[in-house]
């Protein structure tokens, strides 16, 4: 049982396959992208299971990551049981009612060895907290000024350190703004 982000790191960076038969809980973009990635790496993604009656991911990712690979998306469903000894062997999924509670008698059993959790992200804030940078309680990320400088003079933040981004396009623009401001800061010779 891994987060989709951890699986992404293992597969993309470390070159380790995390499973052969996979069920993904949550249909956010990272979960959808990992469904495709796991399939391309040779795994069989049995299902993408979403508690809500709609996907949390972009429509293009649903098409390109699930539909194109015949991976079923179970909306208004959740995992109700995970079985196995020493590792995952089976996942039980059930439909949920309007109250988001499992509906008895709707269980589906999946023979699998891996569960990926894609159920919400928080910003990467370990270094932010260590540096005693002011945090935004709404986003759990660093508070930044318009130029992306944090509450600590000379420290700039962008991307998932500030808040979780859905599209890399937004991270690119933000990182360019932060990089330019950091360079201007260094060149100005300002010091506290």
Predicted regions and their residues:
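Residues forming the flavin
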Residues: 1-192
């Amino acid at each position: 049982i891994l987060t989709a982000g951890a699986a992404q790191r293992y597969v993309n960076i470390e070159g380790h396959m995390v499973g052969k038969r996979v069920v993904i809980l949550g249909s956010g973009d990272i979960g959808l992208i990992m469904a495709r990635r796991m399939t391309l790496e040779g795994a069989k993604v049995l299902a993408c299971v979403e508690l809500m009656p709609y996907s949390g991911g972009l429509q293009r990712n649903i098409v390109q990551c699930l539909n194109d690979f015949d991976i079923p998306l179970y909306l208004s469903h959740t995992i109700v049981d995970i079985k196995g000894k020493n590792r995952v062997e089976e996942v039980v999924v059930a439909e949920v009612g309007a109250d988001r509670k499992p509906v008895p008698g709707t269980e589906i059993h999946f023979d699998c060895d891996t569960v990926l959790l894609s159920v919400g992200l928080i910003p990467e804030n370990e270094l932010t907290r260590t540096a005693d940078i002011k945090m935004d309680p709404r986003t759990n990320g660093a508070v930044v000024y318009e130029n992306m400088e944090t509450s600590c003079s000379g420290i700039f933040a962008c991307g998932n350190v500030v808040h979780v981004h859905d599209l890399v396009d937004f991270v690119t623009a933000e990182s360019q703004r932060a990089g330019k401001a950091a360079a201007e800061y260094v060149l100005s010779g300002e010091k506290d």
